[in-house]
Amino acid sequence: MKFVIIYLLFSQMIFGQNFGQNKVQYNTFDWEYIVSPNFNVYYYGDNYDLAVFTSKVAEESLDQIGKHLRWRSNKPVKIIVYSSHNDFQQTNIVGAYMPEGVGGVTELYKNRIVIPFEGSYTQFKHVIHHELVHACINDMMYGGNAQGLISGRILLQIPLWANEGLAEFLSTDWDSETDMVVRDLAIEEQLPTINQLNYSILAYKGGNSVYQYITEKYGREKIGEIFQQMKRTQNAEKGFQNALGVDFEQLTKDWHDYLKKEYWSDINKREKITDFADKITDRTKTRNFYNVSPAFSPDGNTVAYFTDQNGYMDLVLHSLDSGKQKKRLIRGNTSPDFEELKWLQPGLSWSPDGKFIAFASKSGKEDSIIMVNTQNGDYDKIPIALDGVFTTVWHPIENKIAFIGHKDNASDLYIVDLDTQEVINLTNDTFSDFSPTWSDDGSRIVFSSDRGSSTGSPDMFNVDFSQRDLFMYDFAIEEIVQITDTPYNEDYPSLTKDNLLFYTADYNGVYNIFRHEMGSEIFSPITNAITGIQQIDVDSSGDKLVFSGYSERGWDLFVMSQAQNREKEVIPETRFYSERNDVDTFEDLRFVKTEKPNEESQDYSQYIFSRNYRRFNDTNKDDEQDPAPVSY
């Protein structure tokens, strides 16, 4: 599961404080920009190709957004691209601090989009599209300037759920993550009202679901009519009522009925996670949201994991023998070395002797690999000269750690020698890599990637990076071998001594655990969860499996026994997955059409992608701070 995407754009609502929220300017950026018909894309350093990718995605997204809103852009939008989240946190375009999890921001005074590239093209494309929806709504409803709204001259205030929900709906439509969140709400009978969506993180996934219902019942053409009516009446609810014929109270009832019909029939087809695994954390008692990134100790008696029980992301040890929390090793967000614990792309890993745990952390201006003593909490750190470091995994024999590193426009699989601190790039291409795990003898690394069957460093705009397969780096031949080749998402691999590979996949629309006998064609489901599973780890015996499971609006940890012997014959598809290839066409109702409505792709031959445009590099005028309202 692409966990980073689920909470990508709203996690800033969860954590009230972060260490060092006053911005520190570590770097001076020499900005350049490229020009396309509707965008000026600003970049720096060696990120010209990333800027071109951004411009192409933005132009493609703008046409889709305009078609839905029945609106056409008449002024260029500025997009400022940072090559890492660490650089993004230094921006002066908006004054707010950008903690881990804020994937992009739209500044509404000058209608500028600010986004970081964090190694995943899927995430990056989603954020471009999502933030552009905000910029388009701002231009359409407020003339591209929110001053009228703030001064009171404009009365219309678009509800958070209507704004963020549409941004999610248009940028992702519907996927396994959204389905998981909404399915859980329906099954647990915790569906909010339309108005209640404004006061929680459900404004994103819940709002998406409302638009999904509206377009299924009334057609996609209604989206543009809703916003046209909002603008005409200067009232959000009247906009919906005039377009749909129902007020928010009736819309809530209709939406709830739709979801109950959709999901309640699934209850007898699938299992609750507690039906096949033992829960070792309990969010209902600790009142937190995240318990993630579990990792077995070498003896299998302790599980290390990240948790936000105290409002910060901490590293905690849990004893399986006593069933209780043993100790809190690291308190995140409270010191310069633990500014952020990379909980969106986590990876905890024990040393072979069980004396240390490794993880990645933001430490000042750069990321580091931290190795903390499990007995006394002392730690060492190795600064890594990359744009981002994620998901560490300790070599089973040697003093080395594999990790995912992000540099410029790519994320790759790396190894660092802990004795010499030499860093080696193993994959070294443009594709995005994730979730490495070692084989028992250290001769192979299995990982997840969006590379498919492609090789080299192609133009990523023309690559289908929408899903991940599993791959293996074989040190004997120094080559990458593909393990899975499906149109689905495989992730979080974990290998046993017996050459069994466990991983998660959404083959049926729900993220479940699968088992694969390496070297064979046997792939077997071992769970049939009703919600979703991620971030798995198998103990040294290969018998116990720990994972993070989603239920009751959050993530808990579970341990499953006899993982080698479990098997499910059939796991039925969800409705959205069975209909995922259906094409939902609708009429383009914009008044002016300068392009063929059924064009398959955009012609970029007339675009100006010039390296000679510079934006006053010494003054950085476009990086001057405004006390501006923002939309995430």
Question: What positions do the PLM features span?
Answer:
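Sec-dependent N-terminal signal peptides
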Residues: 3-13
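A flexible loop/linker signature enriched in serine peptidases of the S9 family
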Residues: 180, 287-289, 306-316, 333-343, ...
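Predominantly a core beta-strand signature of beta-propeller blades
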Residues: 275-281, 323-327, 377-381, 421-423, ...
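Blade-terminus and WD-like Trp-Asp/Gly-His loop motifs, strongest in beta-propeller folds
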Residues: 294-302, 348-356, 392-400, 436-444, ...
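Outer-membrane beta-barrel initiation region
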Residues: 568-632
